[in-house]
């Protein structure tokens, strides 16, 4: 059976502001199943942003586990991410999950992968999902050549990804921490 997948999640950090956004498309194979899914959320008393790409059920499972790790480590984003990645890599059932997360709080942005990687993005820009490369390239160009806010950069980057990637649409949800 095919999995639900396909999305774009992008995050931009500039100064003391961070924005994280995603599109709303969910596909099953080559069929659009839903256009308004919410793949970007606020968790841990609205202090942490999280966006997910990959298999929808897998992503929700990881999101629940990440939230539990945040609670356990009193909101320490880096510690929670490392602990989730360790579990993800060593637990036989978790290893089968196909998803990625971008997480951000007031000071830190991290990408968490199923390979057990916890990555601190270069230049405060990161993107995941099927349209991630398009969104990341657009965001990098906008950061280097404009004074736009992180929110505006994320919005424009998702728009460009939506124009280019068939698994990304223009229904955007963007969250910010300032």
From Swiss-Prot:
Regulation: Allosterically activated by HslU binding.
Chain segments annotated as transmembrane: none
CDD domains found in the cross-reference section: protease_HslV
Protease among keywords: yes
GO molecular function terms attached to this record: metal ion binding; threonine-type endopeptidase activity
UniProt-listed InterPro entries: ATP-dep_Prtase_HsIV_su, Ntn_hydrolases_N, Proteasome_sua/b, Proteasome_suB-type
Main location group: cytoplasm
Keyword set, alphabetical order: Allosteric enzyme, Cytoplasm, Hydrolase, Metal-binding, Protease, Sodium, Threonine protease
Gene Ontology biological-process entries: proteolysis involved in protein catabolic process
Catalytic residues, chain numbering: 7
E.C. numbers: 3.4.25.2
Location of this chain's protein in the cell: Cytoplasm
Record: residues binding Na(+): 162, 165, 168
Reaction(s) catalysed by this chain's protein: ATP-dependent cleavage of peptide bonds with broad specificity
Cellular-component GO terms for this entry: HslUV protease complex; proteasome core complex
Classification via SUPFAM superfamilies: N-terminal nucleophile aminohydrolases (Ntn hydrolases) (SSF56235)
NCBIfam families, per database record: ATP_dep_HslV, PRK05456.1
The family this protein is said to belong to: Belongs to the peptidase T1B family. HslV subfamily.
Function: Protease subunit of a proteasome-like degradation complex believed to be a general protein degrading machinery.
Subunit structure: A double ring-shaped homohexamer of HslV is capped on each side by a ring-shaped HslU homohexamer. The assembly of the HslU/HslV complex is dependent on binding of ATP.
Protein name: ATP-dependent protease subunit HslV
Record organism: Burkholderia cenocepacia (strain HI2424)
Protein encoded by which gene: hslV
């Amino acid at each position: 059976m095919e999995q639900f997948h396909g999305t774009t999640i992008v995050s931009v950090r500039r100064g003391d502001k961070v924005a994280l956004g995603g599109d709303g498309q969910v596909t099953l194979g080559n069929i659009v199943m839903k256009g308004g899914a919410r793949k970007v959320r606020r968790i841990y008393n609205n202090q942490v942003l999280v966006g997910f790409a990959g298999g929808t059920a897998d992503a929700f499972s990881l999101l629940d586990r990440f939230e539990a790790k945040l609670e356990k480590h009193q909101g320490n984003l880096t510690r929670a991410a490392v602990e989730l990645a360790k579990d993800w890599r060593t637990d036989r059932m978790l290893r089968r999950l196909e998803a990625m997360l971008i997480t951000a709080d007031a000071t830190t942005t991290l990408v968490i992968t199923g390979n057990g990687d916890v990555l601190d993005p270069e230049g405060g820009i990161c993107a995941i999902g099927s349209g991630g490369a398009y969104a990341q390239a657009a965001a990098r160009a906008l950061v280097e050549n404009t004074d736009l806010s992180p929110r505006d950069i994320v919005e424009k980057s998702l728009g460009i990804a939506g124009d280019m990637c068939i698994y990304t649409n223009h229904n955007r949800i963007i969250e910010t921490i300032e």
